[in-house]
Structures are given as structure tokens and as C-alpha cells.
Amino acid sequence: MSPKMQALLLLLGLITLLVVHAEEELSENTESERGCIKLNQECVQNKTPCCNNRPCLCYMRFNICLCEKPLGEIFGR
């Protein structure tokens, strides 16, 4: 493979990586602007909702509530 082709492929790979990273940051900003709580973050039931309609599950043993994945999301449904 020619050096020009290798440089072009490297450049395309870097651009793709930057676009994916920028999309992740944008989705995080959108969630925080909506006022929802991210996955595995502390939550209070019936207050600020968890993002993506995830449940706020409380663990009395540890005296903490967290936004968790629903069972369907855990098992890939």
C-alpha cells in the first residue's frame, strides 16, 4: 500500500474517532440539560428522573438509590 493511501486511511480513522467522541459528549450534555440522572448515578425516587426512563432502584442495605438498567436492557432485549 502506498504511503499516501496509508496517510489517507489514518486521517479517515482519526476523523471517525473524533466524530464518535463528539457525539458521546453531545448526548451527555443533552441529558444534563433535560435534568435527568445518568446510569449508575445516585437518584431520589419521585424527584429528578433517570435518563432513558431507567428505574431508580434503592438498596436499603447500603442506604443508596441508583439509576439502573432495566432487565430487558441487561439481557439485550
UniProtKB/Swiss-Prot annotation:
Signal sequence extent: 1-22
CDD domains: Spider_toxin
UniProt keywords, alphabetically: Disulfide bond, Knottin, Secreted, Signal, Toxin
Short name of any one Pfam family annotated for the protein: Toxin_9
Key word Signal present: yes
GO cellular component, one term: extracellular region
Top-level division of the source organism's lineage: Eukaryota
Proregion residues excised on maturation: 23-34
Cellular compartments annotated: Secreted
Chief location category: secreted
Xref: InterPro entries: Spidertoxin
Gene3D superfamilies: 4.10.40.10
Disulfide bonds: C36-C51, C43-C56, C50-C67, C58-C65
GO MF entry, a single one: toxin activity
Tissue specificity statement from the Swiss-Prot or TrEMBL entry: Expressed by the venom gland.
Comment block on domains: The presence of a 'disulfide through disulfide knot' structurally defines this protein as a knottin.
Recorded family membership: Belongs to the neurotoxin 02 (plectoxin) family.
Protein's name according to its UniProt entry: U18-lycotoxin-Ls1a
